[in-house]
Amino acid sequence: MADWARAQSPGAVEEILDRENKRMADSLASKVTRLKSLALDIDRDAEDQNRYLDGMDSDFTSMTSLLTGSVKRFSTMARSGQDNRKLLCGMAVGLIVAFFILSYFLSRART
C-alpha cells in the first residue's frame, strides 16, 4: 500500500478513503435499517401472540368453570339412589356410542 500511496497525491488518497468510508457507512446504515425493521416485526408478532394467549386464558377459565359445574352435577346424580345409577350407566353408554358414531362419520368425511 505504501507504493500505491506514493504514486498518488495525498488529496487523491484521502478522497478514495473518504469514498470507501461513505460506501461502508451506507452499507452499515442499510443493515441497521433492516435489523430495525426485523426487530419491529418480531415485536408486533410477539404482541399479537400475547393477545391470542390472553384470549385463550379466558376461554380456558370459562371452560374450567363449566366443567367444574358439570362434574358437580354428575357427582350429585351418581351419589343419589339406585334408579339414577341405571340412568347414569345408560347415559354413559349412549355417550360412548354417540362418540364412536360421530368419529366414524368424521373419518369417512375426511377420506
Curated annotation (Swiss-Prot):
Subcellular localization, as worded in the UniProt entry: Golgi apparatus membrane; Golgi apparatus, trans-Golgi network membrane
Entries under InterPro entries matching the protein: BET1_SNARE (IPR039899), T_SNARE_dom (IPR000727)
UniProt modified residues of type Phosphoserine: 9, 37
Record key words, sorted: Coiled coil, Golgi apparatus, Membrane, Phosphoprotein, Protein transport, Transmembrane, Transmembrane helix, Transport
GO biological process: protein transport; regulation of retrograde vesicle-mediated transport, Golgi to ER; retrograde transport, endosome to Golgi
Main location: Golgi
TM segment ranges: 87-107
Annotated ranges, domain t-SNARE coiled-coil homology: 15-77
Positions on the Cytoplasmic side per record topology: 1-86
Lumenal side stretches: 108-111
Membrane topology (UniProt): Single-pass type IV membrane protein
Any one annotated GO CC term: cytosol
Assembly and interaction partners: Component of a SNARE complex consisting of STX5, YKT6, GOSR1 and BET1L. Interacts with STX5.
Name of protein: BET1-like protein
Biological source species: Homo sapiens
Gene: BET1L
